[in-house]
Amino acid sequence: MIIYPSIDKLLEKVPSRYSLAVLAAKRAHELESGDLKMLSDYKSDKSVGKALEEIAAGDVIIDPKSKMLERDAEKLDRKDQE
């Protein structure tokens, strides 16, 4: 169960719970792979908790350009399958 940061604070930074879950998972994977940490101090010891703390701090956001690229790639995949 998430105590810190609160889900309400996180949803101020991300438009939906689904987007929050995906963003946190991707960032946690980056942290586990050795990516640089964006905060100097974390309350959580786990990578998902650290990712959520970075999201709450506003240091990790959803890149609108990457969302557009993903949509374009999905459209191309659909056309290729037809």
Curated annotation (Swiss-Prot):
SUPFAM superfamilies with a match to the protein in the record: RPB6/omega subunit-like
Gene Ontology, cellular component aspect: DNA-directed RNA polymerase complex
Protein name, as recorded: DNA-directed RNA polymerase subunit omega
Species: Lacticaseibacillus paracasei (strain ATCC 334 / BCRC 17002 / CCUG 31169 / CIP 107868 / KCTC 3260 / NRRL B-441)
Segments crossing the lipid bilayer: none
Coiled-coil ranges from the UniProt annotation: none
GO MF terms held by the record: DNA binding; DNA-directed RNA polymerase activity
Quaternary structure annotation from Swiss-Prot or TrEMBL: The RNAP catalytic core consists of 2 alpha, 1 beta, 1 beta' and 1 omega subunit. When a sigma factor is associated with the core the holoenzyme is formed, which can initiate transcription.
Top enzyme class: transferase
InterPro entries the record matches: DNA-dir_RNA_pol_omega, Pol_omega/Rpo6/RPB6, RPB6/omega-like_sf
